[in-house]
């Protein structure tokens, strides 16, 4: 009976470029198999977060179990694992794929193959998954299914002549997709007699059950009461509940090899159940864990401060709660002279950073100031010490530094061939090194570049979109460190360094960047009763200056005619007063000032 059950099980995930209709297709599959009633049906069922629905993106992996009855009466259990499509969440995608045997590759019939289609598809091929191409949005007048089929065959090299042509929006031909899954996705392998091995492909914190681990059982059996051990952290727990997803939790008495489900074991800390870790039995552990586990490493750092200093504790609580559900978020307290107490937070990428900031503001109702994002630099000092720096204010004195290294990414950009020149110019301006380019078809090109990560984290994506009228798509992965000539650029207001505005920039750009930021600050800092010099400095050398003029009262209004010396006396008196004010006056830096710097090119 058990083997029979395994024969009728299929584990698959859906991969696609952003906006090619992945979550909508998942909705239709849930609907077609009757997993959810009409009443429970809503758009993007698997995207549970408000933000996910609003932005139309998938952030966390989710899972659902579909029961599909074929026309011959046979019942199949299809486990769908929904994956995020954005490049920041690449690791989550790779863990979700490791839990499957097959992947549906959704391609938009109007747009064809895009950068993330390729990136996610190669990820799936790395995991030896069977790929089932599905062409979506064929109800649109601009759909060109035959060309897209050829493109899939030429570029990715998988057969697509019999790919289902569907419209996830209208529900057209959804049954073909279910048939293709049953036909093409392999039966899960795994030995129920062997020691337990379960891959965690996602985990989240539930305030009643503790940490809930989403798992794919590779070998063995797990049931409530089993003593389990996490192989990366060596922590041991007793299982309290096992079950499956009908998107909502449904307890079962056990999970066997080949199943996808969840395990709870009164775990208090998400860190103990890292995504990608292997669960095994404490009394009969597996010899080695499943491969591919790596702790989530933040790539981008930024300071987050409460606008109202008294709300520091609330911000700390908010970050603690978000951390429960997001193992990739890291934070530590820091203080800034300009902004008071706050936290230095690490993120997977820019989208991840935006989402966390937005969730703090929305879910916890806090006003926050965020500083310019920065990456991790390696600094080698003359005394042989090596420092990793995420905050420009911690950079040692330039005289102590032997050399500095910055992280570099390998970026693949797919663009219509008309815009190749503009894309290459953008990459060169961002200190990119050309690798190669190849034509996918006569009208589209893949361009590969090595680009320093700190050039990408500001506005690279926006500029790429505007230079290509929104047609280009980008995918990048970290590619190690390389030596660079970098300096710390400080901004001074009224002679004081504003630490939150400091940044690390390439030496040859320091002057232009300093000048541009000074001009920008001049626009956003409100005028005071005394004049404020805004200076950009590298070390002790001032490289640019702007002045915010003082507001002044017309002290000569009451002199009609009269002697010049009388007027001079009044003006001198005013000047003295302004000078005194300037010595004791402090400058408030508005939130816009921090944000405007990000947009300076």
Curated annotation (Swiss-Prot):
Report how it sits in the membrane.
Answer: Peripheral membrane protein
Q: Which SMART domains match?
A: EFG_C
Q: Does Cell membrane show up as a keyword for this record?
A: yes
* CDD domains reported for this sequence: EF4_II, EF4_III, LepA, lepA_C
tr-type G domain sequence ranges: 7-189
- Domain of life the protein comes from: Bacteria
| Cell membrane recorded as keyword | yes
Q: Where does GTP bind?
A: 19-24, 136-139
Q: Name the HAMAP family for this protein.
A: LepA
Summarize the protein's role: Required for accurate and efficient protein synthesis under certain stress conditions. May act as a fidelity factor of the translation reaction, by catalyzing a one-codon backward translocation of tRNAs on improperly translocated ribosomes. Back-translocation proceeds from a post-translocation (POST) complex to a pre-translocation (PRE) complex, thus giving elongation factor G a second chance to translocate the tRNAs correctly. Binds to ribosomes in a GTP-dependent manner.
Similarity comment: family membership: Belongs to the TRAFAC class translation factor GTPase superfamily. Classic translation factor GTPase family. LepA subfamily.
Protein's name in the database? Elongation factor 4
């Amino acid at each position: 009976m058990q083997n029979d059950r395994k024969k009728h099980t299929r584990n698959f995930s859906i991969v696609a470029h952003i906006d090619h209709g992945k979550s909508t297709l998942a909705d239709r599959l849930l609907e077609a198999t009757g997993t959810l009633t009409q009443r429970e049906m809503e758009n993007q069922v698997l995207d549970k977060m408000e933000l996910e629905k609003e932005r139309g993106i998938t952030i966390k992996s989710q899972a659902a179990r579909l029961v599909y009855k074929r026309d011959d009466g046979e019942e199949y259990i299809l486990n769908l694992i929904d994956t995020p499509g954005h490049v920041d969440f690449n690791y989550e995608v790779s863990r979700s794929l490791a839990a499957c045997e097959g992947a549906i590759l959704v391609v938009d019939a109007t747009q064809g193959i895009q950068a993330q289609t390729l990136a996610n598809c190669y990820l799936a091929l790395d995991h030896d998954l069977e790929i089932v191409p599905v062409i979506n949005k064929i109800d649109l007048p601009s759909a060109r299914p035959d060309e897209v089929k050829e493109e899939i065959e030429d570029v990715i090299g998988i057969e697509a002549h019999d790919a289902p042509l569907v419209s996830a929006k209208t529900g057209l031909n959804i049954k073909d997709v279910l048939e293709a899954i049953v036909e093409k996705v392999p039966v899960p392998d795994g030995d129920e007699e062997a020691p337990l091995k379960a891959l965690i492909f996602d985990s989240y914190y539930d305030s009643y059950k503790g940490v809930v681990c989403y798992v794919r059982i590779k070998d063995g059996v797990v049931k409530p009461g089993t003593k389990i051990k996490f192989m990366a952290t060596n922590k041991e727990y007793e299982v309290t509940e096992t079950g499956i997803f009908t998107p909502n939790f449904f307890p079962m008495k056990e999970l066997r090899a080949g199943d996808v489900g969840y395990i709870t074991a009164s775990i208090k800390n998400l860190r103990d159940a890292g995504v990608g870790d292997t669960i095994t039995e404490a009394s009969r552990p597996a010899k080695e864990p499943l491969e591919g586990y790596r702790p989530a490493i933040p790539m981008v750092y930024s300071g987050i401060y409460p606008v109202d200093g008294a709300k520091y504790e609330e911000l700390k609580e908010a970050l603690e709660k978000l951390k429960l559900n997001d193992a990739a978020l890291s934070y530590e307290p820091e203080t800034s002279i300009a902004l008071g107490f706050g936290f230095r937070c690490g993120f997977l990428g820019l989208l991840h950073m935006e989402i966390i900031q937005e969730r703090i503001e929305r879910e916890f109702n806090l006003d926050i100031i965020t500083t310019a994002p920065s990456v991790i630099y390696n600094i080698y000092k003359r005394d042989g010490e090596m420092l990793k720096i995420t905050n420009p204010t911690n950079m040692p004195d330039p005289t102590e530094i032997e050399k500095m290294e910055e992280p570099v990414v390998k970026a693949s950009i797919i663009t219509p061939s008309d815009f190749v020149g503009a894309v290459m110019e953008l990459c060169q301006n961002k200190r990119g090194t050309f690798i190669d380019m190849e034509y996918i078809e006569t009208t589209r090109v893949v361009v590969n570049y090595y680009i320093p990560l700190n050039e990408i984290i500001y506005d690279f994506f926006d500029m790429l979109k505007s230079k290509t009228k929104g047609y280009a798509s980008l995918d990048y992965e970290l590619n190690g460190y390389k030596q660079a000539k970098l300096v710390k650029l400080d901004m001074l207001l009224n002679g004081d360094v504003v630490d939150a505005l400091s940044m690390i920039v390439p030496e040859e750009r320091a002057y232009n960047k300093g000048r541009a930021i000074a001009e920008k600050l001049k626009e956003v800092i409100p005028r005071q009763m005394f004049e404020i010099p805004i200076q950009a400095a590298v070390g002790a050398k001032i490289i640019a200056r702007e002045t915010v003029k003082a507001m002044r009262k017309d002290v000569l209004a009451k002199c009609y005619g009269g002697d010049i010396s009388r007027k001079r006396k009044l003006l001198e008196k005013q000047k003295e007063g302004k000078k005194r004010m300037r010595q004791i006056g402090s400058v408030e830096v508005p939130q816009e000032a921090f944000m405007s710097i990000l947009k300076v090119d």
